[in-house]
Amino acid sequence: DGTISIGNNAGKNVTSADGSTFVGSGAGASVTTGGKNTAIGYSAGNSTTTAEESVFVGYFAGYNATGSSGAGVAIGSQAGREQKIGSSVYIGRMVGYKHDGSADYAGGNNIGLGHQTMYGIKRGAAGNIAIGRSAGGALDGHDVSNEASWNVFLGYNAGRHVTSGSYNVAIGSHYAGGAMYNLKDGNQNVAIGYNAFQGDGSDGQKPELNVMIGGGAGGGGSLMKTPSHNVGIGYLA
């Protein structure tokens, strides 16, 4: 069937996973059916039973990914661990790792790249792009259609604490707070610049249809009290 297994218990339970490659101790050890998988690394893809056309590379990458993890990619130590990876791409250490032990998996079509990017994404959050360390690290779809979905976060800590907002674009890096760093909710906002439209971390605020461009633009102050249809351009605008 063209399956290659190298390592202690690698692919040991395979019954019909044609064209798969399992390399490393415990790699793909629980895969039974579903072909064309690649699992390389200690326990990569382990406890994943019916994945198909998926790629898991790294220590515990794709470990315990669910049965519908078809055509997903998880590369990096613990990338995509405990996650429903279907059609998503997680690259980097702990990217897309759903670490709370629940069965509240993320939706599909997410792209995460960077150290702990999308760390903890869950409950149906789908179609997001997060690039940069800790970007998009709290996305929680609450199993509601289009919640915590279709966001773009680019930069270190961009959108770090956004939980349920959708259709947002945040571009900007900062070690203590990237664009939309402390904003928990809100839809169709654009923030460009370090610390732009940070929010103050409080619950109940739901800004919509704002554009903030510039370092610190929008901030967490007065604009957050009138959160819709604002435009701010310039440093601390």
Regions found by a protein language model. Name each.
Residues 1-237:
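Glycine- and small/polar-enriched repetitive beta-structure motifs of secreted/surface proteins
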